[in-house]
């Protein structure tokens, strides 16, 4: 079963997790018109990541709500990372997970612009 790492102590769950898999939902904070929230991509990625984490008995990391949304620059509410910042962020997370003996890191991407 996927376990979301949030405000409660998950250290024992990490210790007991034998799958060696961590999943991080990655979305974006950007406009989607007046009919959808700014975090639509994060909501979608989180939904699928939770399902996959349960199926794989993986640890579910908190969602990354920001991505590269350069195509939406100028729309109010959009927060975009530079591609090199996103790459550095992912590398840092990968290094941290590797140090904790996580063998597989899955990014469940919910935003087409995250192509850094």
Regions found by a protein language model. Give the residues of each.
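Glycine-rich, flexible loop/turn motifs
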Residues: 32-34, 60, 77
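Short Gly/Thr/Asp-enriched flexible loops that form oxyanion-binding sites at enzyme active sites
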Residues: 36-37, 41, 112-116
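A generic structural signal for alpha->beta connector loops
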Residues: 20, 55-58
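Glycine/small-residue-rich interface belts in oligomeric ring/scaffold proteins
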Residues: 45-46, 60, 65
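Active-site histidine-anchored catalytic micro-motif
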Residues: 2-7, 63-116
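Short catalytic helix/loop segments, enriched in acidic residues and glycine
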Residues: 39-54
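Active-site and ligand/interface coordination hotspots across diverse enzymes
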Residues: 1-37
């Amino acid at each position: 079963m996927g376990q979301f790492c949030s405000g409660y102590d998950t250290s024992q769950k990490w210790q007991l997790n034998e799958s060696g898999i961590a999943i991080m939902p990655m979305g974006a904070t950007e406009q989607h018109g007046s009919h959808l929230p700014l975090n639509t991509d994060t909501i979608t990625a989180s939904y699928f990541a939770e399902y996959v984490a349960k199926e794989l008995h993986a640890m579910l990391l908190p969602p990354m709500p920001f991505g590269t949304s350069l195509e939406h620059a100028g729309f109010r509410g959009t927060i975009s990372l530079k591609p090199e910042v996103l790459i550095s962020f992912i590398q840092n997370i990968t290094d941290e997970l590797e140090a904790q003996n996580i063998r597989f890191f899955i990014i469940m991407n919910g935003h087409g612009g995250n192509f850094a």
